[in-house]
Amino acid sequence: VCGLLAILIGLTGCANNNSNKITVVGSSAMQLLAEQAGNDYRLSHPDSNIVVQGGGSGTGLSQVQAGAVEIGTSDVFAETQKGIDAKKLQNHLVAVVGIVPIVNKSAGVSNLSKQQLSDIFTGKITNWKQVGGKNQTITVINRSKGSGTRGTFEGLVLNGKKPIQAQEQDSNGTVRKIVSSTPGTISYISFPYANDENIQKLSIDGIKPTNKNVETNRWHLWSYEHIYTKGKPNKNVQKFIDYMLGSKVQNDLVPKLGYISIDKMQVERDSNNHVVQK
């Protein structure tokens, strides 16, 4: 009897632990925030089990739609993605993140026009000397096709033009490492990852990539960080979402990690990239 009781207690404990598990999958841009918030949440909710993974916005949306994970994170609106039924998902805006073009410092440039940036990523400009830099071949590093950061960048910079065929990388960290160590390279990453002194962050049309400029939309390259659930979240998931939207995360963790609180934004953007003043 005692042995049976011990087994039942053990099974109950496992069931409770499993029921408290929240798997978060998707945006690599949001991964840093989700991981840190998850770690902090566990300190005050020791029975919680939050697992955070990247994979890109496309993966996050498809996984949450399939019911394979509790939360899918994305840099893009669900309704813009093929194969995703946005009506079946619930959207929670958690933060805003800026996106910045970065180059290896050997290129010798610190500012490009939006047109020059577009011409580089479509293959029209192939040498840094064409934009005032060194006589050095340009090597484009793109993001993977499921990347929300790529979707935002191409939507706002390329305006429907076909990007050049290039090496593709999934994560912000990998892109930063490649650009910092490879002469001639250019790519783009989210603000929270652009803190390496070995890369050159580019201004666009003389406007610097700062959070303050994002808040007013002077810097156009930014996206919302979305948390998506399949329909109404269960109680445990809702508690974690409420924590993400609460003052501790929004006022402390979000700015500390280089993101921007939704409350700081002076503009709003819809799924068609239309921007209006709040």
Segments predicted by a language model, with ranges:
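Sec-dependent N-terminal signal peptides
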Residues: 1-6
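C-terminal motif of bacterial Sec signal peptides marking the signal peptidase cleavage site
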Residues: 9-13
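Exported/periplasmic ABC-transporter solute-binding proteins
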Residues: 14-58, 62-66, 70-278
